[in-house]
Regions:
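Bacterial Sec-dependent N-terminal signal peptides
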Residues: 1-25
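Signature for phosphate-centric chemistry
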Residues: 23-147, 151-321, 325-421
Length: 421
């Protein structure tokens, strides 16, 4: 090869390597805790938001997710153990694989007969949220009334009872009424009963972009580290093994169990796996360029929030309305409201992880509190707290207190036309 061509080839290879190693602008570097996604326990909350002296809280609308729980089913642990036991029988399991097998056996045993149940951590989360609400708004609980409803799911029912029992412990003069069951599904489980959404979900319109992302993003290396034979698993099988491994391990903090995820995944691998789960939540639980149906299922719930606030102003409602549902209850609602950080429109789904983060939006025990205040002039304003942190309601505004009529007009416009009062 002539010398000048060799030099050009070396230079080209050098710049090609620079290009290949350049930072991916869509890559994330979230912490291991954050990469647990919706399994992350509720964040610590120690600081109360100062309320101006001119405002008096008169009503609270609360929509909450159940607290931390055991894994919802045995599916992921079963798949991990099936793969690892087969590899072990073939003499192809690494020390890391044996360690994972032992850990997965422990998770399965710990969850036996408790799949999906609220655990002690989840109970404590609900009691903590209730206690902070009580301390922040003591006047509302002085001979006040509390109305609570929940999904029929046992973990939601138990979350409601832990919350309301804590309020009763703090002040047993509070009048409490609770309701659970399928009659609450239109508000708490609309993903089960709204026909348009159920049909859209079954159409699997969302599946092609998700599968494409998963197949190009989910790593195979973690599975290769579990098994000595590099040919034991195909790439597609390895991705599925890693996915089930990730689901088992990332769910452990919600069980109150500590786990060092860095023993099984690099930071890059963990972020890649989380981004796949995050994208699936985004595609099937929020408004996207594919469809608005996932957000529209929360229309009845949003209308209920508007109507109960109106009724409170008219003196026809309880002091506090509590609702206990699921992450799948909150994600559509927050998207429908276009709440900051909870709504993102794009045709580039590889950017979703930068702008829409499930661990910020719906950790275990996630909640939206809509607090109505009366001003010293007799007017009303409202503040929205996501996970007990105030968030602006209106686009292009950082104000956290919004006049009720202005907030009401905005929320009504979020509803489909046939539901707008």
């Amino acid at each position: 090869m002539p010398r000048n061509i060799r030099v050009i080839s070396i230079i080209f290879a050098f710049f090609a390597s620079l290009t290949a190693s350049a930072a991916d602008p869509t890559a994330t570097a979230y912490t291991a805790d954050e990469c647990c996604g919706t399994h992350i326990p509720y964040p610590e909350r120690n600081h109360d938001t100062a309320i101006p002296d001119s405002l008096t809280a008169v009503f609270i609308n609360h929509v909450g997710r159940h607290g931390a729980r055991y894994p919802s089913s045995a599916a992921n642990t079963t798949e991990v153990l099936r793969t690892l036991h087969r590899a072990d029988s073939a003499g192809a399991l690494t020390p890391s694989g044996r360690e994972l097998m032992k850990l997965t056996d422990f998770v399965a045993a710990k969850s036996h007969n408790r799949w999906g149940a609220l655990d002690s951590l989840g109970m404590a989360e609900q009691r903590g949220i209730a206690s902070r609400m009580f301390r922040a708004y003591p006047r509302l609980f002085a001979d006040g009334t509390v109305s609570a409803i929940s999904s029929y799911s046992p973990r939601c029912v138990m979350s409601m009872y832990e919350f309301t029992h804590q309020l009763d412990r703090l002040n047993n003069s509070v009048e409490l009424t609770t309701s659970s069951g399928r009659r609450n599904s239109p508000l708490m489980r609309p993903f089960d009963v709204v026909t348009e959404y159920v049909d859209w979900y079954k159409s699997r319109e969302w599946k092609a972009p998700y599968d494409m992302y998963f197949e190009t993003t989910a790593p195979t290396a973690p599975a290769r580290r579990l098994i000595t034979d590099p040919n034991y698993l195909s790439n597609s099988m390895a991705r599925e093994v890693v996915w089930n491994e990730y689901k088992v391990l990332s769910g452990m903090p919600a069980m109150g169990l500590s786990i060092d995820l860095s023993k099984y995944f690099t930071t890059e691998e963990l972020n890649a796996l989380w981004s796949c789960q995050n994208l699936q939540h985004y595609l099937v639980r929020t408004a996207t360029t594919l469809s608005s149906e996932p957000a529209l299922i929360a229309s009845e719930l949003l209308l209920n929030l508007i109507n109960t606030t109106d009724a409170a102003i008219e003196g026809k409602n309880a002091n506090i309305n509590l609702r206990f549902g699921h992450a799948e209850t909150l994600m559509p609602l927050l998207s429908l409201m276009r709440l900051r950080g909870c709504y993102y429109m794009t045709n580039y789904f590889d950017t979703v992880a930068l702008h829409w983060k499930d661990f910020d939006i719906v950790p275990m025990g996630a909640n939206l509190q809509m607090v109505l205040f009366k001003t010293d002039k007799g007017d009303y304003c409202v503040r929205f707290d996501l996970n007990e942190r105030p968030v602006p309601l209106l686009p292009n505004s950082d104000e956290i207190y919004t006049p009720w009529q202005q907030a009401r007009e905005y929320l009504v416009h979020c509803l489909p036309l046939h539901l707008q009062p």
